[in-house]
Amino acid sequence: MKFRPCIDIHNGKVKQIVGGSLKDAGDQARENLVSGQDAAFYAELYKNAGLKGGHVILLNGKDSEYYEATRNQALKALAAYPGGLQIGGGVCPDNAEDYLKAGASHVIVTSYVFKDGQLSWENLKKIEEIAGKEHLVLDLSCRKKTISILL
């Protein structure tokens, strides 16, 4: 068994949020825990414990007033553990190379390559050209939803 640590960053703070509670409008989420430590603290902790393959996730979108604070926390984590963490949350061709240069081992993409339940091969090719397939993780996250079928 492998432990894969995670650093979720929302509104510039390391948090554990209640699954499915994240709302872009108002930058709101129900919280289980808001840490008093910054993201670099956890990155150092994981590095010192020899835990690789963890990830840093930016939970604020680019339009959020908190985006820069969230992004700065993520960059501090990558600097504290270069090559030890993956990064996700709004990753696209415009920022993938910057995250890799900042120390991310991989970039995680979801919404950039998946639109309306379909894989965009064009977008996948674009991000692969920037990041390289050896540094690219496709996130196939799913969430239980009610499905209505009309007969």
Pin down the residues of each PLM region.
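Hydrophobic faces of well-ordered beta-strands that scaffold small-molecule active sites
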Residues: 2-9, 54-56, 83-89, 107-109, ...
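Conserved anion-binding
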Residues: 10, 15-25, 100-151
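Short catalytic helix/loop segments, enriched in acidic residues and glycine
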Residues: 20-44
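Catalytic domains of carbohydrate-active enzymes, especially glycoside hydrolases
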Residues: 41-57, 102
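Generic structural signal for hydrophobic
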Residues: 45-49, 77, 99-100, 127
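Glycine-rich, proline-tolerant flexible connector loops at the mouths of alpha/beta enzymes
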Residues: 51-72, 111-118
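Alpha-helix-loop-beta-strand connector modules within alpha/beta enzyme cores
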Residues: 64-86, 124-141
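Catalytic cores of alpha/beta
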Residues: 73-106
